[in-house]
């Protein structure tokens, strides 16, 4: 089953600001995750259905939400580790509920 990729508006703005090389790396990972987004090792602790993609060499992370009933993957935020984990709870509360 293939999932549909969506971006939260704020995450899309972050995406547009990324270096094209970083975008390309994330695109490669996102294509794989759209086939199978439920990767146990990438699950974010304390958040159901939230996962991450890490680009270790570049220091970036991307957090995404899997909505099973809609068969969708939502990119929530993109950034360096310290920034991402600070804004993630705020982004979830403002965008989702």
Regions found by a protein language model. Name each.
Residues 2-6, 10-13, 17, 24, ...:
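Enriched for short, Lys/Arg-rich terminal
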Residues 17-22, 42-46:
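Short, mixed-charge, low-aromatic patches
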Residues 21-33:
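Compact soluble domain cores
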Residues 31-55:
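A short, surface-exposed loop/turn module that caps and links secondary-structure elements
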């Amino acid at each position: 089953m293939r999932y549909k990729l969506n971006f939260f508006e704020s995450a899309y703005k972050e995406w547009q600001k990324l270096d094209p090389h970083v975008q390309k790396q994330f695109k490669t990972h996102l294509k794989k995750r759209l086939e199978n987004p439920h990767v146990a090792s990438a699950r974010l602790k304390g958040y159901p259905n939230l996962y991450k993609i890490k680009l270790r060499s570049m220091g970036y992370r991307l957090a995404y939400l899997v909505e099973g009933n809609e068969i969708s993957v939502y990119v929530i935020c993109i950034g360096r580790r310290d920034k991402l984990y600070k804004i993630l709870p705020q982004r979830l509360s403002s965008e989702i509920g």
